[in-house]
């Protein structure tokens, strides 16, 4: 018989840097999850990723206070900012452009994000990422 799910927690935690301080501690503490157990498991799983990159994680908490978690790829906005070499996107994306990304960079990001995107193929994934880039005030070249 399957365990009964008591809650799902969605967080964004830096790769290899989960610790009991907010936002991780309070979110898990409310559901009665062993915080240190999660932190150790998360840090072990994300140890090979780039340190400090934000990793969305979905934690499923069960009735017996056990948990499972699934990590996703870093947000497209983080990858785009890194590719363009900027700190933040534009406050006015249609009038104020803050950087440039090439089609090759978009393809690279789309390949990395492919497991999390609902796009039918790589071309559709690239178009999705290009739309995100334009909405951040980046110019897409190519």
Curated annotation (Swiss-Prot):
Posttranslational mods: One or more lysine residues are methylated.
UniProt keyword annotations, A-Z: Methylation, Ribonucleoprotein, Ribosomal protein, RNA-binding, rRNA-binding
CDD domains membership: Ribosomal_L11
UniProt key word Magnesium: no
Subunit structure: Part of the ribosomal stalk of the 50S ribosomal subunit. Interacts with L10 and the large rRNA to form the base of the stalk. L10 forms an elongated spine to which L12 dimers bind in a sequential fashion forming a multimeric L10(L12)X complex.
Role according to the record: Forms part of the ribosomal stalk which helps the ribosome interact with GTP-bound translation factors.
Protein name per UniProt: Large ribosomal subunit protein uL11
